[in-house]
C-alpha cells in the first residue's frame, strides 16, 4: 500500500514520484516466524524449524512455514503453518488482542536487525510483489537468502503465495 499510494498523484493516477520499492520493507513475517518458533520449542517433532526452518510469504493468506529446508516434511510444515496462522485467532477467542509481542518481534526486533545489516524475516520487492523472505540490507542494497535447493513442494507453496499477491494488486 505504501508503495502504490505514494506513487499516485492527487487524482489517483500513477505518477511514479513516490517511494521506490527498495525503500520499503514489511515486517509482518517477523511475528509469524516468532510464532512458528514458539510452537517448535514446545513440540520435538517441530524442533527442526529452530535451526533449519524458514518462513515465506505474506503475513496473512499465503504464509507458509517450512519445518526444514534440508529435511523438508510436507505434513509437519503444513501443521506448523496452521498452528502459526491460527495462533492469533486463538488469542482473540479468549479475549486478548495481542499488541506487545507482535510489536517486538515484528517491529522493534526486525527493525534493529535491519539497521544492523543482519539476517531477518521481512517482505521485500521480488518479481513485482512484496514477498516475505529471509533478507538483510548491505551497502549494495537488499540481499535475499540464496538457498542451494528448495524442495519442489515448498517451492510450489512459495509460487502460490506470489501468485496470490499478484492477484490482489
Model-found features: residue ranges?
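Long, compositionally biased stretches enriched for glycine and/or charged residues
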Residues: 42-169
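Rossmann-fold dinucleotide-binding core
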Residues: 1-72
Amino acid at each position: 500500500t505504501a508503495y502504490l499510494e505514494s506513487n499516485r498523484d492527487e487524482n489517483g493516477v500513477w505518477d511514479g514520484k513516490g517511494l521506490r520499492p527498495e525503500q520499503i520493507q514489511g515486517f509482518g513475517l517477523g511475528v509469524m516466524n516468532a510464532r512458528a518458533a514458539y510452537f517448535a520449542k514446545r513440540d520435538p517433532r517441530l524442533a527442526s524449524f529452530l535451526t533449519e526452518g524458514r518462513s515465506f510469504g505474506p503475513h496473512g493468506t499465503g504464509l507458509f512455514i517450512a519445518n526444514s529446508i534440508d529435511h523438508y516434511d510436507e505434513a509437519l510444515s503444513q501443521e506448523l503453518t496452521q498452528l502459526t496462522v491460527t495462533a492469533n485467532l486463538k488469542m482473540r477467542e479468549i479475549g486478548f488482542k495481542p499488541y506487545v509481542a507482535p510489536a517486538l518481534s515484528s517491529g522493534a526486533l526486525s527493525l534493529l536487525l535491519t539497521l544492523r545489516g543482519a539476517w531477518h524475516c521481512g517482505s521485500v520487492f521480488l518479481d513485482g510483489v512484496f514477498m516475505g523472505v529471509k533478507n538483510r540490507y548491505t551497502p549494495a542494497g537488499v540481499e535475499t537468502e540464496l538457498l542451494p535447493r528448495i524442495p519442489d513442494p515448498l517451492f510450489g507453496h512459495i509460487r502460490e503465495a506470489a501468485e496470490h499477491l499478484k492477484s490482489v494488486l
